[in-house]
Amino acid sequence: DLNLLLQKFPNDSLASQAQYKLVNIYKNWKFDPRKVLINLKLTTENYPNSIHSDRAQREIDAFPEWIINNAESLRKRKMNNKSINNLNYMIEKYPNHELSSKAQYIIGDIFMNDLRDFDNALIQYGLVIENYSESKEESLAQFMIGYIYANILNDFEKARLEYSKFISRFPNHELTPSVKFEVENLGKDINDIPALKHITS
C-alpha cells in the first residue's frame, strides 16, 4: 500500500515517486478527480525539489482542462456516471472557470444522447442558462430545451415558448433561421410542410 509506505518512509528517495504514482492510480483506475488533485498537491508540498513536483505543478495548472478531457474520454468508454461525476466536480471546484459552462452543457448532453433521460437533460440544460448567462453554451442549451420539447416530448406549447426565448435572446445566432422554421411548423406532418414535401415524395 503506497499510503502506508509514505507514512513509514516519508523521506525515502523514492517517496516522491510513490506519491506521484498515487496520482496516476486515482487518474487511471479510480477516476476520482478530487483525490487526483489532493495527491498532486501533496507531491508539490512534500517534495518541492523533486522532478515529480515540477510535473505535478504543471498538472495542477492545467487541471480544469484535464477534467474536461477525462470526462469526455470516460463518456466515450460508456462510463457515463463517472463522466458526470468528473464534470460535477469541475463545476463545484472551479465555478467561475471558463470551462465550467462547457462542463454543465456536457452533463445535459450525456443525459440527452447517452442516457436518453430527457427530464434530467432539461434540468441540466436549464442550469447552463441559469448559471452561465453570456457563455457560448447558453444559446446551445436554450436551443436544446426547445428541441427536446418539440421533437422528443411533442409538447408543442412548451417548445414554442422555449424557441421564442431563443429567437428573442439570440436574434443573430446561426441557428435562428432553423428555429424560426421549426416554430412555424410545430406539430405539422412532414407532408404539410412545403419546403420538406420533396423528402417524402
Identify the residue ranges that each predicted region occupies.
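Acidic, polar-rich low-complexity tracts and alpha-helical solenoid repeat scaffolds
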Residues: 1-201
